[in-house]
């Protein structure tokens, strides 16, 4: 697939990069939160939206981000107020599953393993590049998404992209919800693991090829996090629309392959997330629904889907 990318030129290369970035962001989540010195107030109000129906009933939609950057003292007053007044606080999945749940989901780590797919040579190339994989040939027994998670914890990636695995926004929200005892899942970890397993058979080689471009991995992670912490929502809007526009320009066979990937990983989930929020409003609840910010934006993002259904979507910044 790497040769295919080079032959097809910049459009295909950019498209694959954008699609792979979706995976990198999605499966690098579930970090931990701990007390750190120099904690600061993080303004996330530009990613907070009040969603209302024609009767004025509303819930909140929030775009979160899995990797963190700065120690968190609190979020801005607007977001904190929305959290405080919400009946339930939703995130994509439980950050601290029970031992039984953990045992259930770990079985997915070996489905479509690198070894089973005959891709050990590509994994060996990654071992040479990333300290988190160095000297660990046994990790070929896992699938590509486990390897991706390990790469997202690689010391060089964390350092150069300015990532802190202890300061994630969604973990702050999760702990807030645990104190209020009102946490709910939008999807659940097992759902996400099944989804990734479904993708891993057909797309592992492509993902491994892109992970081999360490410079791109670091650059993409840094750009995404820079955009979030600077409140640049237009970055995500442009990125998602560029991806969709480039999908339309592919030949039929490539278009079918990558549209399937996009639908499974993003669009179908966007619809489910939109429906979760709509159900909240319909049931007269004031809920706070936080999902990865990339799900919110673009022509097929949650915000546009809600507008298409007649909801008023207002940024709280």
Predicted regions and their residues:
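A conditional alpha-helix N-cap/helix-loop micro-motif detector
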Residues: 41, 72, 266-270
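A cross-kingdom marker for long, charged
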Residues: 255-317
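Bacterial signal peptide processing site
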Residues: 31-33
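Short, Lys/Arg-enriched N-terminal segments with co-localized hydrophobic residues
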Residues: 1-11
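Structured, acidic catalytic/metal-binding patches in enzyme active sites
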Residues: 36-39, 48-257, 261
